[in-house]
Amino acid sequence: VKTDSTAYFDSIFQPNRDSIEKFFDNLNQLGLFNGVILYADNEHIITEKAYGFAEVKPKDLLTVNHTFQLASASKPFTATAIMQLVEQNKLNLKDSVHHLIDSFPYNEITVEMLLTHQSGLSKYTHFCDNPDTVWMNKDSTITNENVVDIMHDIIPPLASTPGRKHYYSNTNYILL
């Protein structure tokens, strides 16, 4: 329930376009921020702005349309999406990954093992960066599909027995 006092505090602490941009302008000028911001309220974009460079050499300025690899920052989103599928009975944590991805070469690995880093899968960088790997286009970003194809083609050795121990490997979330 909004009262006069809470409405007053909301107006004081409500960030506006100018204050947000000034904050990031200052950080950028100090060399402390290089990236893209987007601030929205109730699905309404308040501000969207790029700061700094996408590439330092050559000096390609960032735009709001540049894409970034999120890396491990995407894991909570992936885990949440998987658990929503479980809640909707569209997926089971005990499902074999092989039944979900036909070309996946390991029958005993489950969705739950991928989520908890207990699949035993080695890090994809260990087998995809190998000079003997079928990944020929080393100058472009490898995709999740590329990793699955390589796993199918070379069947890399497992780092540990599936379900036995925790071994942090980004390969798990590539598959999810």
Language model regions located:
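Short, conserved catalytic-motif segment at the N-terminal edge
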Residues: F9-F68, N92-K94, D149-L158
